[in-house]
Amino acid sequence: MLKVVTFMKQVATGLQVEGNFGTAHVYRSSLNAIIAYCGKADFTFEEVSPEWLKGFEIHLRSRGCSWNTVSTYLRTFRAVYNRAVDLGKAPYVPHLFRSVYTGTRTDHKRALCDEDMKKVFAKLSRTSGVPFAVCQAQELFILMFSLRGMPFVDLAYLRKSDLRDNVITYRRRKTGRPLSVTLTPEAMILVKKYMNRDPSSPYLFPLLKSREGTKEAYREYQLALRSFNQQLMLLGELLGLSDKLSSYTARHTWATTAYYCEIHPGIISEAMGHSSITVTETYLKPFRSKKIDDANKQVLDFVKRSIVGVSAWK
């Protein structure tokens, strides 16, 4: 019968050959977690049961994995299992993954509060000894926010041909959805400041050098992302932010700011290129309770003003 570890390695290799290096990386990380849990070099799909999966979930949590990481590993393994079933190489077990967590949690708030936003968008003084790399990270963060919370991966892979006049047109790498963003004058200033000066490079920004779709380009992207997040962490410490600053923060902050501006979640979803409005709602969920509380306070304040002097309610 088909062996799990062997099959997952084959799937990961196939993904890499197709140029899906990020997905291949997730599959290998999931596989390493599975090997650490089962303690065997390989095993068959027949050995996988609801109890086995629950044990894997408990094992991951005991290692300090977040619920979202647990979900990623389990969903990855479920995809591998389904592929094996489709090939007739693994037995179909109804509701095999029913007892384990495969959802998405929003326990951790990634968006900036108003006070932190003011700090991040304020101009840094180079005379105060702030490193150039930190200033650059701040301005790229502001640019990503200005481009409707563009993910760093999409920024890195933007091509010069994607920019026409003051409009950037591109496809989201995660969902493949086409997006068109009109640049504000402020965003255009930042684009011109950091755009690639190498005439032989197809990329709009000098974050990558190798040809798109190659393993080298993926490695360059990973290094650029790691460096960007390191500089953002330093920026957050320098500004005394209440929450950690990362590449994700620009995207989540744009979504929640739009939400507080009374923009419909459907429009926010379209603007961000989400695969569905459900993804957008995951971004907004942590802030709905506060917005509902604010709405309740507005109602109560209105009632208080209306009945002042005629009610025992004080």
Give the residues covered by each predicted segment:
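N-terminal core-binding DNA-recognition domain of tyrosine recombinases/integrases
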Residues: K9-G22, L31-H108, K123-T127
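Catalytic-site neighborhood detector that most strongly recognizes the C-terminal catalytic loop/helix
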Residues: A111, R172-G176, M272-K297
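Active-site/catalytic core of tyrosine-dependent DNA strand-transfer enzymes
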Residues: M117-K118, T184-S242
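C-terminal secondary-structure termini that scaffold catalytic or DNA-interacting sites
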Residues: P199, L207-K215, Q298-K314
